[in-house]
Amino acid sequence: DLDVVIANNIDKLFTYKPGEWLTIRDFLRSQRPTWDRYNSSVIRFDSGQLDNMWQEFNNNQRDIQKRFRGDQDYIWDWAKKNKPATLFPDEWIRSWKWEVRSSKEWAPGGRPGNRTFKTIETVRPDKNCCITVFHGDPNPENCKDPFVVDNWR
């Protein structure tokens, strides 16, 4: 995904559980600990490993786009029926908005797609976190937190 900021070395994402396809638990996990849906911001798979998923999507695009709200819902549904993903450890990939920052308040006047936070925070992800994800608002380019400004390129 393009709305992520690399926080620390990402090598372990490529060496963890070789041969398995991996993704992350959706960030509602921070509000519902048993939430088992996927977030598609970070996925790792070997070439050809998910060809069946792609072929099903390619052959049924219109129907799939009508049935599912987005790619994450389709991927989760496909995986349930075919080959569930192995999950990266939650602490390796964090939601900037829900798991790194403390304040979630929006600045006044912003519209969805162009909002930013009301306050600037000097937080940074812990040493185990490789990637921070910006799902929904704000996008990294709209976030004024120093860590994001310094690392978003």
Each language-model region and where it sits:
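GT-A fold catalytic core of metal-dependent nucleotide-sugar glycosyltransferases
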Residues: D1-W35, R44-F45
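Short, surface-exposed beta-edge/turn micro-motifs
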Residues: G19, N39-S40, N128-C129
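Catalytic core and acceptor-binding pocket of nucleotide-sugar-dependent glycosyltransferases
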Residues: S47-R153
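Sequence-level detector for tyrosine residue identity
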Residues: Y16, F27, W35-Y38, W54, ...
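A conserved catalytic-core signature of glycosyltransferases
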Residues: D1, Y38-S40, G70
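A short secondary-structure junction signal
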Residues: N8-D11, P33, Y38-S40, M53-N58, ...
